[in-house]
């Protein structure tokens, strides 16, 4: 008997698969392969097996998907089994697929979806993918990227490597346009030919402010989980997923610097996720523009949808971002882990903002320069180098920043550079807080008074005033701890000024 079913799919271990290498071509290739399987090939496969009219795609992006299927349960089971094998074959064993389904009815959509997700979770926990060492011997060559068993030689650019089948497939997809295609088409409409960088080194060479400096920008949606749980119908879910996916893609394309040799490459784009590796001087402006455009676009798309407009209070959805700065030779794994940590910090700040609502959290941005410290974890760097304890606790930064504050600190950093204040004086200003509260104040005043031009002094004073700092400290009374917190914007400001063109 043919019934209606809701089918949910999920690809576990995406981060390990996509970001488990330090080669740009493999990272973007793995991401493109996953995106192609997820957004296009899964729906085509299901329709070919079960019939065009028997498959309705609710959404399929970001490593997950949801479909409404009309079929006999035995046919659905057989199709799901074949689909899992299809994912393994297409990725050469690099990806696996989890599926769950339940009988579907429009009246009980959310309950049916919960049952399908429960079945998917059950499959995941009962059949875990347990990593194990592969066979190694002195006469077997290891893969140069993942240490698996190499199967063939592969060339990209001037480099030749011995790779396993999984990594070869990543490289082959990395040679294609992949996620770059939509951005290239967007640029072509503007009469621009977008030239993609071939490796991390080339991205660093395109940094105009400080050569070889790069950044990894990682963004994720705020309060999305709560909003998804409030959805009651299939149509609402479809509207929501399409609006989010389209908005994050459009925001990314419009925010990227679109001129000639693009100093960036898109590593992850879909659902509410965004990751771009780019030159250090373009990262902060890109993050600001992407966050602002995403909120504007979702607000516009939901304006005609009473359900979402009511839940969001007429506002749009938001994303928070983490920016890990480094050099082109900084191991990607370090920049990735730091961007994840910074993203969590931003999302936490948004969830604690006084302007947050039940389904809304303001966008925040956090950033860190990995090459300035020895610690891998951002929290360790800040605890070791950016906290003073004399005689009371002093924090030498104000990160993360809300979107208005992030825009303000960028503008003031530009003003410092445009005022032609000598670079050595700016560096000394940035180091002043590290001297302690009293000596730091004296050093800051000395440098301020020693700045001869009135316009330059005004730029320094305006920047400190905007963030409530008095040469250079800001004291905030913490009522919960019954103590005074001392912070400064000066360190953050000078760090950011170092990446202004």
Regions found by a protein language model. Give the residues of each.
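Regulatory and interdomain segments flanking nucleotide-handling catalytic cores
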Residues: 1-501
């Amino acid at each position: 008997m043919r019934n209606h079913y809701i089918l949910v799919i999920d690809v576990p271990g995406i981060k390990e698969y996509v970001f488990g290498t330090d080669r740009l071509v493999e990272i973007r290739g793995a991401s493109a392969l996953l995106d192609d399987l997820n957004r296009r090939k899964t729906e085509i496969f299901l329709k070919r097996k079960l019939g065009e009219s028997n498959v309705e795609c609710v959404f399929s992006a970001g490593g997950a998907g949801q479909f409404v299927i009309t079929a006999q349960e035995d046919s659905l089971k057989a199709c799901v089994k074949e689909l899992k094998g299809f994912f393994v074959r297409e990725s050469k064993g690099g990806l696996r697929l989890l599926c769950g389904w339940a009988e579907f009815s429009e009246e009980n959509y959310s309950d049916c979806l919960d049952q399908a997700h429960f079945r998917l979770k059950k499959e995941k926990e009962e059949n875990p993918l347990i990593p194990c060492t592969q066979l190694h011997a002195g006469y077997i060559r290891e893969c140069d990227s993942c240490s698996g068993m190499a199967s063939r030689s592969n060339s990209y650019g001037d480099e030749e490597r011995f790779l396993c089948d999984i990594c070869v497939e990543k490289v082959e997809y990395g040679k294609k346009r992949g996620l770059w295609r939509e951005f290239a088409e967007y640029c072509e409409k503007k009469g621009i030919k977008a030239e993609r960088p071939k490796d991390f080194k080339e991205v660093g060479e395109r940094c105009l402010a400080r050569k070889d400096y790069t950044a990894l920008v990682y963004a994720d949606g705020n309060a999305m989980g709560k909003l998804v749980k409030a959805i009651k119908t299939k149509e609402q879910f479809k509207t929501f997923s399409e609006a989010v996916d389209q908005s994050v893609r459009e925001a990314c394309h419009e925010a990227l610097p679109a001129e000639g040799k693009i100093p960036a490459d898109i590593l992850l784009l879909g659902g509410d996720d965004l990751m771009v590796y780019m030159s250090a001087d373009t990262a902060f402006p890109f993050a600001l523009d992407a966050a602002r455009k995403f909120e504007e676009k979702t607000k516009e798309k939901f304006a005609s949808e009473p359900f979402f407009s009511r839940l969001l209070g007429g506002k749009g959805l938001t994303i928070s971002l983490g920016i890990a700065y480094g050099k082109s030779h900084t191991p990607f794994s370090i920049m990735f882990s730091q961007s994840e940590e910074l993203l969590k910090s931003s999302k936490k700040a948004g969830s604690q903002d006084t302007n947050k609502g039940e389904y809304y959290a303001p966008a925040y941005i956090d950033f860190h320069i990995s090459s300035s410290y020895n610690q891998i974890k951002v929290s360790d760097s800040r605890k070791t180098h950016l906290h003073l304890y004399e005689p009371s606790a002093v924090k030498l930064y104000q990160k993360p920043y809300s979107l208005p504050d992030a825009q303000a600190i960028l503008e003031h950093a530009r003003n410092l550079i445009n005022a032609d204040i000598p670079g050595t004086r700016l560096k000394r200003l940035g180091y002043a807080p590290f001297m302690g509260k009293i000596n730091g104040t004296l050093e800051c005043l000395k440098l301020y008074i020693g700045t001869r031009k009135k316009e330059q002094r005004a730029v320094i004073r305006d920047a400190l005033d905007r963030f409530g700092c008095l040469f250079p400290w800001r004291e905030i009374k913490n009522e919960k701890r019954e103590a005074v917190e001392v912070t400064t914007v000066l360190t953050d400001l000078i760090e950011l000024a170092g990446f202004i063109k």
